[in-house]
């Protein structure tokens, strides 16, 4: 499972700073599309520290939430938070591979926030969701769509042209089209066995005071940059990312640098 491994301090930073400033963008969109009649059994794959499970529980009169994540410190935080949810049962466990140990067709809902951008990872995630969700159950994925973080990709392309770094130039071309489109993501869900596919798309922006502010921000350090690096698939990112930092300082010296995030949430119903 290609997710950033979180140490104890990183898990705490994610919960304190990344969830309220960034993951809520995806969680709120997901909650808007969450269908429930009051009772639900939810599996949350890549649950990190357990957001937005408490908000889902607030909508339910009975049921359960099972969360899975590859990072033990994140799971410990999720368990602590889950123990404070009175209305439904919660269970959080560490996992590393698909398929998980959970039983087939055991859940009414399957959710994931900010999954890996790698296509093979998303296909594996959707296949596991299709296995776990019962017929007519709902899957919800909320993720950055095509066009997200394009400002960084453009600056990396500028670096490649300036320093004749052909490998990075090719990587940026791949990265610029790596994130899913509405049409592409719809097809992915349908191929995995889901129907009634609907996608909500909300463009937003993240503001940074400088290149250093961007590079040191927990949102970038823990979620966005590792995802970009994995998409680029280049070994040495230090020099090009230093160029990005300096370019932001130079081009946006008198104004705020805004990074585009196209927040998308896709919903589908498991076909019988």
Go through the PLM ranges and name each one.
Residues 198-253:
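C-terminal helical/coil "lid" or tail adjacent to the Rossmann-like core of SAM-dependent
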Residues 108-122, 143:
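A short SAM/SAH-binding and catalytic strip from SAM-dependent methyltransferases
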Residues 41-100, 124:
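Class I SAM-dependent methyltransferase SAM/SAH-binding core
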Residues 98-110:
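A short acidic, Gly/Pro-enriched loop at the edge of an enzyme's catalytic core
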